[in-house]
């Protein structure tokens, strides 16, 4: 059933119909469309278009349809309706006859779809927030279990200074917490209802749009009808949030792919999130993580595509805006799936503490400690930096770590070095000295874990 046609003397070409129809993807808005229609029927009572009895009949039929949709949403795809609005209205007319044709009074598909999409976005943000917090909790739990797992920290993918696996986990907790705050912030701007704005100039019926917004669970109604039906910056905002969130998950995945590699060998992933090779029987591939990393690109693409779609559109509604849904649906689905998968990866991960500690002791990760030691002895830092660089060259030449050089070797570079240098070159000393807020000291890490647990409880 088409919602238009009186103006036309020829039927649409079937090829155009297939090109134009959106039911194959906007069927996902069925529940929101029905909920919005129930609220609209109540608004029509307040302006005398519907009687209370008519509204009750419509609401009952819409609620029956809602249950049918929840039981089998795929049934919608068997229809040749143009879009979800046409499908819902057609089904309603099947149930209540001519009365169903009164429901669209004063309403346009322009404000209808804007409302449906905002309702869907609000529901989906709630799901994303839950998944995000579940992953944060999984990271905090993994951190708590691995506070003593010393490993190398990297800059430029070269061993830099010792950290702990717990500190690494907590770094991603911070990123995810910012992702969470962005979603919460987006939810505030989503929480305004466009219903009642009509096609572009507002509805001709004196409907209380604030009351209507409240019936739909919105905090308020939008202030400008042109803007309400023609902008999709809330879509851009969620796509931006998804793009940033997926970058964080991609980096998380890349780190663990490296940690799991034969070259690093810091962790072993569970069999539940890995796969094998059809040719090489020894392989255990980190496919879950590689897919998280790979899926990041499609989310960035959805954001870029939507920005390009909107950038040249004149006010108000244009059919181009039908392109807002597929990329949004896919991007948020992908982000949600990846949040769940990242949590699953952490469930069963094994940290190889001896190998991590061995790697942390290599690569002269304690060189900065020697420089700080010299500074404490009165040597200017820039000079100390140069002295330690020379000492590292000597250690490399001898094939030894810094702490294995003799005192005589070290004193060749600075006479202020004494026997008390050796304790400060230990891994434990390196960690304990980083005791300022946010540092890697055991005390700071334990405090950060407790604070994160309290925030997430």
UniProtKB/Swiss-Prot annotation:
Subcellular location per the Swiss-Prot or TrEMBL entry: Cytoplasm
PROSITE patterns in the record: FUMARATE_LYASES
Chief location category: cytoplasm
Name of the top EC class for this enzyme: lyase
Keyword Amino-acid biosynthesis: yes
Disulphide-bridged cysteine pairs: none
The name this protein goes by in its record: Argininosuccinate lyase
Species of the source: Klebsiella pneumoniae subsp. pneumoniae (strain ATCC 700721 / MGH 78578)
């Amino acid at each position: 059933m088409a919602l238009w046609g009186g103006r036309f003397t020829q039927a649409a070409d079937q090829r155009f119909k297939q090109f134009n129809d959106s039911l194959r993807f906007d069927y996902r808005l069925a529940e929101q469309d029905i909920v919005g229609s129930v609220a609209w029927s109540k608004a029509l009572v307040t302006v005398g278009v519907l009687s209370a009895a008519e509204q009750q009949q419509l609401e009952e039929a819409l609620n029956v349809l809602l249950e049918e949709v929840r039981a089998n949403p795929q049934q919608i795809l068997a229809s040749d309706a143009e879009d979800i609005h046409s499908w819902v209205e057609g089904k309603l007319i099947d149930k209540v006859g001519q009365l169903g044709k009164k429901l669209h009074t004063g309403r346009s598909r322009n404000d209808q779809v804007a409302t449906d999409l905002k309702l869907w976005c609000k529901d989906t943000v709630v799901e994303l927030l839950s998944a995000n917090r579940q992953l944060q909790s999984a990271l905090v739990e993994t951190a708590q279990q691995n506070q003593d797992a010393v490993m190398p920290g990297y800059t430029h993918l070269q061993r830099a200074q010792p950290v702990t696996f717990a500190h690494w986990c907590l770094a991603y907790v911070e990123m995810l917490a910012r992702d969470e705050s962005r979603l919460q912030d987006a939810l505030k701007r989503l929480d305004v209802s466009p219903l009642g704005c009509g096609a572009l100039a507002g509805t001709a019926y004196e409907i209380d749009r604030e009351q209507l917004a409240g019936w739909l669970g919105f905090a308020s109604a939008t202030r400008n009808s042109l803007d309400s039906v023609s902008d999709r910056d809330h879509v851009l905002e969620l796509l931006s949030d998804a793009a940033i969130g997926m970058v964080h998950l991609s980096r998380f995945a890349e780190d663990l792919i490296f940690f799991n590699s034969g070259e690093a060998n810091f962790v072993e992933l569970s069999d539940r999130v890995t796969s094998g090779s059809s040719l090489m029987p020894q392989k255990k591939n980190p496919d879950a993580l590689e897919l998280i990393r790979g899926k990041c690109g499609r989310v960035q693409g959805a954001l870029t595509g939507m920005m390009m779609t909107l950038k040249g559109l004149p006010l108000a509604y244009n059919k181009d805006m039908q392109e807002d849904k597929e990329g949004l649906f896919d991007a948020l689905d992908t982000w949600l799936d990846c949040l769940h998968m990242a949590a699953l990866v952490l469930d069963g991960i094994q940290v190889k503490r001896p190998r991590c500690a061995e790697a942390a002791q290599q690569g002269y990760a304690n060189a900065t400690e020697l420089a700080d030691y010299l500074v404490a002895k009165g040597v200017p830092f820039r000079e100390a930096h140069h002295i330690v660089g020379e000492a590292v060259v000597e250690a490399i030449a001898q094939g030894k770590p810094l702490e294995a050089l003799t005192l005589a070797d070290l004193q060749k570079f600075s006479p202020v070095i004494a026997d008390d240098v050796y304790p400060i070159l230990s891994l434990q000393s390196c960690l304990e000295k980083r005791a300022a807020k946010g540092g890697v000291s055991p005390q700071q890490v334990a405090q950060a874990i407790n604070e994160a647990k309290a925030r997430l409880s």
